[in-house]
């Protein structure tokens, strides 16, 4: 059984929280993005990354992929989100420099696949032990 949770906190140094998440448990999809603090529009970037990937997965579910193409598909989702963020930054000067980190996973049976951008990390909690992936 897979159990997940999400808790977000702005931390001690930030004025705002720039985290975004998306979970689709029935599809085994979990995404967390953290807008880069100190840059313009971090919250916008994290929200865009999560929504772009969520839409891609809703339109073209991962479960329909062959096992040997899953990681490539996850990579293409992250790349599409990155391109969308870059275009938004070009279109609107107030967004110049906006950025986000992201980690996502797809869990299918006893296998888990991960993709990330930046320094966001994934962890597994098993048998009372938290381990970085």
Model-derived features: where do they sit?
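PP2C/PPM-type serine/threonine phosphatase catalytic domain
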Residues: 1-133
């Amino acid at each position: 059984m897979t159990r997940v949770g999400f808790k977000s906190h702005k931390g001690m140094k930030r004025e705002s929280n720039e985290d975004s998440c998306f979970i689709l448990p029935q599809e085994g999809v979990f995404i967390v993005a953290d807008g880069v603090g100190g840059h313009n529009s971090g919250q916008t970037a994290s929200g865009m990354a999560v929504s772009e990937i969520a839409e891609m997965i809703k339109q073209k579910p991962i479960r329909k992929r062959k096992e040997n193409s899953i990681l490539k598909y996850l990579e293409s989702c992250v790349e599409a989100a990155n391109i969308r963020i870059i275009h938004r930054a070009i279109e609107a000067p107030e967004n110049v420099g906006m950025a986000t980190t992201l980690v996502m996973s797809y869990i299918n049976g006893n296998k888990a696949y991960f993709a990330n951008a930046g320094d966001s990390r994934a962890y597994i909690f098993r048998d009372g032990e938290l381990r970085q992936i």
